[in-house]
């Protein structure tokens, strides 16, 4: 009886072709998975906290509190979650830098170039941003409580959910001004 049921289900020869296709598919899937696992990832470079200030430097997660970086070119730098409290960045070039979630309380950024910089969630409490150029920057979720923004043009700058200079929270769709 079992043979009769087997022949009904798989035919006279037991349908070995279907079994072979299944095994081949499993082998191919295994090879593809192994190739994906062994392939290099597009991971960010390791932070170098001892690196000198330069364009593209990676100081993410480093402590640079109180650093004197007056007029330094830090364009395209990676400084995610970097401690820059009380740092002197007057006139520094931070164009295109990633300062997301950086701690910059009390820093001096007067006259700095922050065009296209990512300041998403950055702590900017008490920061001096006077005359800073911020076109194309993203300040959503940033904390600007007590910051000095004299002669700063925020036109087009996302400020959604940022904490404004006076402590109020900007509306999620705020751009250029805190609504």
Specify the residue positions occupied by each region the protein language model found.
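Core hydrophobic alpha-helical transmembrane segments of single-pass membrane proteins
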Residues: 25-32
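Intrinsically disordered, low-complexity repeat tracts enriched in Gly/Pro/Ser/Thr and acidic residues
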Residues: 3, 33-37
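N-terminal intrinsically disordered, acidic low-complexity segments at the extreme N-terminus
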Residues: 1-9
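Tandem repeat scaffolds
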Residues: 11-17, 21, 37-179
């Amino acid at each position: 009886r079992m043979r009769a049921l087997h022949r009904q289900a798989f035919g006279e020869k037991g349908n070995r072709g279907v079994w072979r296709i299944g095994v081949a598919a499993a082998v191919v899937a295994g090879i593809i998975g192994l190739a994906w696992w062994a392939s290099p990832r597009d991971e960010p470079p390791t932070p170098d906290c001892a690196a000198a200030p330069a364009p593209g430097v990676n100081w993410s997660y480093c402590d640079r509190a109180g650093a004197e970086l007056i007029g330094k070119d830090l364009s395209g730098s990676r400084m995610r979650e970097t401690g820059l409290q009380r740092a002197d960045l007057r006139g520094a070039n931070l164009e295109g830098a990633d300062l997301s979630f950086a701690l910059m309380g009390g820093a001096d950024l007067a006259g700095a170039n922050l065009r296209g910089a990512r300041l998403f969630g950055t702590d900017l409490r008490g920061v001096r941003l006077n005359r800073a150029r911020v076109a194309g920057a993203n300040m959503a979720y940033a904390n600007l409580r007590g910051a000095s923004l004299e002669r700063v043009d925020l036109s087009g700058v996302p400020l959604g959910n940022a904490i404004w200079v006076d402590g109020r929270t900007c509306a999620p769709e705020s751009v250029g001004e805190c609504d």
